[in-house]
Every structure is written in structure tokens, then in C-alpha cells.
């Protein structure tokens, strides 16, 4: 690890396309002539300009364009009315760039025009109200017409720049462009120009998060080098990877119509001639219950594990028995990657997720249960865990229907203590929900995604609600870091084949995960306070990190025998658990912790979460098969 000293208090970064490194805070990469008022948020070099033209955005809401060879500011744009958070450029358009600011606008700049004003490309306030803030943006490296935008809330937006421009051009050229009736409404964006992505469990959790003053905001978005994946660091939550090629809707509850229970078809094992309806995962949950699939599909027999994977599964089972939930999850994930058609592995991993109970774990457990059922519709434990997951995710009516379905499929379990306990929980929740709706009156209805505000400042338009309901779900989730203190925290792809994911954290560390297994492989201390920025070198195995400390650290591989001067965090699981507690802590406690105060339960070890949800499962145990 090398260290570059910087004399200011916060550093942002830019790694140029050719691979040279440059860092700045008030542009220490250049002379003081381009120093700015306020905290510098972002800078980018204009492509194909010989590293001569530098674009800067700052908290003073201004966007400046500097010529480094003549040491002059050649353009200054003051169109934004709030802090500029990010600048984006595209190699295909060497004279064009974009900015995202906290006024909710995405602006486009064309340096070939003489105008000193920019064009509003996307106005998020037309969709989400006046309080929305744009936080980050990036252009797809393989398709420069594709722009990703992160803003307030859990949704990440992809826009087709070319479609937007063509739509506005056709509107201007239309003979009736200036003639509108009273009922006309001009859409700011054409149909098909926007696509939303969201972690499927987050929309329904928003009311609870808001009540606890927990803010969700996309602090960084970036595409993979191939342009087929989108990585999002979700402030207040986890890091998510979205597959842009094989898209999937948020998982819904869809169950086979019939499944004959017998001693041979339980807990992930079934006879080789078993045939039943399959399970689909392509649609949203609806508040009026779940829909059963109409088509029939062939179910493959249970795949036997090779000896080495059987050993991995046994190690995972042992970790589960010792209540080492994270270790069990990582071992099951390792096995799932090698044997993706084994229902038992998904069912076991779901049980570990349900026991650990970190943010998003019950939704991942739901996904695993559905996958297990799709591979084996007669997987007893997966059916029961599915009902429990739906209950924990606040889909109470669906949980009741799922539990009834479970009792019908497995009548010998219908009166077990586990079923009775879950049934009582669901009944109590339904009564509580009905009482709450009666108190709120007839105007308080609506599904979990269609959340409408009574305030005009943060009202959500009909177009926005449609786009949200058409959103796609994530492929992978990465846990362990904490992202609650700053709104510029990055996550990035790393490795020769982008096989790793890296992210900064509020505890001064940065985390490295395997992309495909989502397993945490290394935690390194990168700052005394917070790691915000992580940028990989485009052609060498270098990683640049920065945060609050007045230094930029450059990381590259070292011999195993070489001392890393205490930078390696040995207790990765303990650090991850502490960060999960920090994310769920009271905001005042987090502020005091960041100021140096010691808060009991936040800065010390221990799993922190009770495991009483499955204590009364009776015959339907949540232990792995």
C-alpha cells in the first residue's frame, strides 16, 4: 500500500481513461487558479481532449470547465440551484457531459454551443415532487446512450438519452406542438425511455424506515466494464448488483397447484419420477393475494452433490448448528454456485438467512424458498419458510394463504406447534392491520408500492408509480459495510474480470466480496473515520481509496509474508455485525458514535439479534436438511 498526502480534509477522485492517477480536493491536481467555494463534489476529464479539459461540480451549485494548459476557466454554468453531486462524460460524445444535483435535475451540457446555459435532460421533480434529490449518475461504457441515475429513495433509474432527444425533437417539429386542449398532458419522457430497478423488499419497508428516520438513497451507481451489470451502493441499506441482460421482476408468491405429500418427498428430497407444476418468479406481489401458475412444467429429480460439495454442505450445517449464520450462508453460497440446481442447498441457505435477520435477509430467504420450490415443488421446509418470510416481509394476507396452502399439501404438519405459532402471529397481524385501516378511514388504502403522499412537495405522479411497478429486481446483494453517514459513498467492480465488488464503509474500512457468491473475502482499514471513494485502475491491479483522512491510499497485491501494518481486519464477521447494528441504530446515536462517543451495543461485538421467531417450530424445524 502506498500513501499520497493531501493537505485538505476530504478527497474525491478521478482515474483517467488511459490509467494515469490523479486526485483532488480543491484540485490539487492543478494550480490554485481553479479553487472553488465550498466542498468539491466531483471532477471529470473531458474525453478525447488530451487530459486538458477538466469539468468540476461543487457545493456552490456551479459547474466549471477549465483548460489546464492555459490555466483558465473557459465555461461557468450556474443553472443548478443546489449542490452538484456528480459529473458524467461519454467517449462517444466528446463535447457533451451531464451533471446531477440536489435540485432534482439532470442537466446536459454541449460545449459546441455558445449558450451559457445547459439543457434539462431529466427533471425528477416532475415525477417525485420538489423534495427529490439527484445524487449520482453514470454512462454505460458500452452504450453511451444509456444513463443511470441514483436519487432519493430505493429506485435506480436507467434512461435512453437518444430516445429522450428524439422525442423532444419530434415534439418541436409537430405542427400541433403549440396547440393544446385543456386535457392535454405532454409527457416529459417518452414511453420506453426509462426503466427502474429496485431491491424487491425495499418499497414495502419505506413506511417503517421513514418512521425510524432511516433514509434510503442511492449514493453511487456504476456499470460493469461489459456494460451488462449495474452496481448500486444504497445508502441506509446494502450494495446491490442488477443484471441488465437477464432481468427479473421482484419475486412474487406463486405456488404449484398440487403436490402429493409422502415420506419420500420432504425436505428437498423426492423420488426420481416425481412430476408437478413448477413455480415462477416473474411478477409483483399484489395486495389481493397471490396468483397460481397456469402452465405445467417438468420437475428435475434431486441432484446428488459430488463428495467435495457434500463436505461443504456438512460444514455449513455444522456452522448453522453452532449459530454461525454468516459462515453457514457463505458455505451454502459456495455450494450453490457449483450446484445451482440443488433444491436442498437453497432451502438450507434460506434457513440461515432467516436466523441471521440482517436487512434484506428475509427477502433473500424468500427468493431461495421460491427457487427450492421451483426445483422441487414438494420441498416441505421451503413451503413453510416461505410463509414465514412473507409474514416477516409484511405480506400478511399472502402469508396466511401460503400457510393454508402448506397445510393442504402437508396435512400431517397442519397441527404442529410451528404452524399454530405462525398462524397466531398472522392472525394477530391481520387484526392489527384492520384496526389501523379503520382508524385511518377509507382514504388510507393502496398497495405496498403505490405510496401516495398528501403533500404536494413530495407527491408521486401516476407515470412514476407505473414505472416503479414495472421495476426489475437485483441479482446479487452484498452485506457487511455501513453506508449511513455520507451521501457520496462508492462501490465498484474490481479485478481483471470484474470478479470482485468493493465498497467503502462508515467504520473506516472497505469491504471486498466475490461477485458471484457474494461472500466477503477481505476487509481492510482504509481511513481513520470513513472510506468514501474507491476507484480501480483500468488496466493494472491498483485500487485507490480515500475518505476523511487527508491522504489517498493506493492498494496493490503484496507478498503474503509482507506486513500490512495492521490494515487487515481479521474479524470480518464481527465488523459486519457491528455495521448492521449501526445501520439500524438511532440517528442521534450514530452521530455521537461518529463524534467519538462510545455507544453500548453499537461498537462492541455480538450478533445482537434474537432468534425467537422459529423457537416454536415444533415438527417443522428450521434447521438445515
Model-based region annotation:
Residues 2-18, 154, 164-230, 235-240, ...:
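Terminal intrinsically disordered, low-complexity extensions flanking WD-repeat/beta-propeller proteins
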Residues 32, 57, 63-68, 87, ...:
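WD40-repeat beta-propellers
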Amino acid at each position: 500500500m502506498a500513501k499520497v498526502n493531501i493537505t485538505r480534509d476530504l478527497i474525491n477522485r478521478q482515474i483517467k481513461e488511459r490509467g494515469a492517477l490523479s486526485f483532488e480536493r480543491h484540485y490539487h491536481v492543478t494550480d490554485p487558479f481553479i479553487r472553488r467555494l465550498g466542498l468539491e463534489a466531483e471532477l471529470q476529464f473531458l474525453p478525447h481532449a488530451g487530459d486538458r479539459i477538466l469539468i468540476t461540480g461543487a457545493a456552490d451549485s456551479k459547474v466549471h470547465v477549465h483548460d489546464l494548459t492555459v490555466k483558465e476557466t473557459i465555461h461557468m454554468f450556474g443553472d443548478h440551484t443546489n449542490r452538484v453531486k456528480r459529473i458524467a462524460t461519454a467517449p462517444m460524445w466528446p463535447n457533451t457531459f451531464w451533471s446531477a444535483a440536489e435540485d432534482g435535475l439532470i442537466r446536459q451540457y454541449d460545449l459546441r454551443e455558445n449558450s451559457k446555459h445547459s439543457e434539462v435532460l431529466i427533471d425528477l421533480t416532475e415525477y417525485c415532487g420538489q423534495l427529490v434529490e439527484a445524487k449520482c449518475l453514470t454512462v454505460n461504457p458500452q452504450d453511451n446512450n444509456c444513463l443511470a441515475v441514483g436519487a432519493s429513495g430505493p429506485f435506480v433509474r436507467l434512461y435512453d438519452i437518444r430516445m429522450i432527444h428524439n422525442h423532444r425533437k419530434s415534439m418541436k417539429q409537430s405542427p400541433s406542438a403549440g396547440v393544446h386542449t385543456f386535457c392535454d398532458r405532454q409527457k416529459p419522457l417518452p414511453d420506453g425511455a426509462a426503466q427502474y430497478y429496485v431491491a424487491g423488499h425495499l418499497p414495502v419497508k419505506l413506511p417503517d424506515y421513514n418512521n425510524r428516520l432511516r433514509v434510503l438513497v442511492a449514493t453511487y451507481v456504476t456499470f460493469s466494464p461489459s456494460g451488462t451489470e449495474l452496481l448500486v451502493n444504497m445508502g441506509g441499506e446494502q450494495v446491490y448488483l442488477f443484471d441488465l441482460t437477464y432481468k427479473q421482476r421482484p419475486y412474487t408468491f406463486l405456488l404449484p397447484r398440487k403436490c402429493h405429500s409422502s415420506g419420500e418427498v420432504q425436505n428437498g428430497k423426492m423420488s426420481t419420477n416425481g412430476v408437478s407444476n413448477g413455480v415462477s418468479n416473474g411478477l409483483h406481489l399484489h395486495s389481493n393475494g397471490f396468483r397460481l401458475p397456469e402452465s405445467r412444467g417438468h420437475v428435475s429429480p434431486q441432484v446428488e452433490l459430488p463428495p467435495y460439495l457434500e463436505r461443504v454442505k456438512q460444514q455449513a450445517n455444522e456452522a448453522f448448528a453452532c449459530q454461525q449464520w454468516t459462515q453457514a450462508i457463505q458455505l451454502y453460497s459456495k455450494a450453490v454456485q457449483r450446484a445451482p440446481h440443488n433444491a436442498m442447498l437453497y432451502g438450507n441457505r434460506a434457513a440461515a438467512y432467516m436466523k441471521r435477520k440482517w436487512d434484506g435477509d428475509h427477502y433473500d430467504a424468500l427468493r431461495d424458498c421460491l427457487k427450492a420450490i421451483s426445483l422441487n415443488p414438494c420441498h416441505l421446509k421451503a413451503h413453510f419458510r416461505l410463509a414465514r418470510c412473507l409474514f416477516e416481509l409484511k405480506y400478511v394476507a399472502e402469508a396466511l394463504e401460503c400457510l393454508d396452502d402448506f397445510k393442504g399439501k402437508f396435512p400431517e404438519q397442519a397441527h404442529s406447534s410451528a404452524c399454530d405459532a405462525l398462524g397466531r402471529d398472522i392472525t394477530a397481524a391481520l387484526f392489527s392491520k384492520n384496526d389501523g385501516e379503520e382508524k385511518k378511514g377509507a382514504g388510507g388504502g393502496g398497495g405496498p408500492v403505490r405510496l401516495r403522499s398528501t403533500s404536494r412537495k413530495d407527491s408521486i405522479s401516476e407515470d412514476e408509480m407505473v414505472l416503479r411497478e414495472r421495476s426489475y429486481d437485483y441479482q446479487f446483494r452484498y452485506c457487511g459495510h455501513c453506508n449511513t453517514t455520507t451521501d457520496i459513498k462508492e462501490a465498484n467492480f474490481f479485478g481483471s474480470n470484474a470478479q470482485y465488488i468493493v465498497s467503502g464503509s462508515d467504520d473506516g474500512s472497505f469491504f471486498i466480496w466475490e461477485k458471484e457468491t457474494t461472500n466477503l473475502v477481505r476487509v481492510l482499514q482504509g481511513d481513520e473515520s470513513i472510506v468514501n471513494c474507491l476507484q480501480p485502475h483500468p488496466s493494472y491491479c491498483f485500487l485507490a481509496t480515500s475518505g476523511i483522512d487527508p491522504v489517498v491510499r493506493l492498494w496493490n497485491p503484496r507478498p503474503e509474508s509482507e506486513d500490512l501494518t495492521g490494515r487487515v481486519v481479521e474479524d470480518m464477521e464481527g465488523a459486519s455485525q457491528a455495521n448492521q447494528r449501526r445501520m439500524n441504530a438511532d440517528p442521534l446515536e450514530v452521530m455521537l458514535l461518529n463524534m467519538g462517543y462510545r455507544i453500548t451495543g453499537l461498537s462492541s461485538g455480538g450478533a445482537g439479534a434474537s432468534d425467537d421467531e422459529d423457537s416454536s417450530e415444533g415438527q417443522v424445524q428450521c434447521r438445515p436438511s
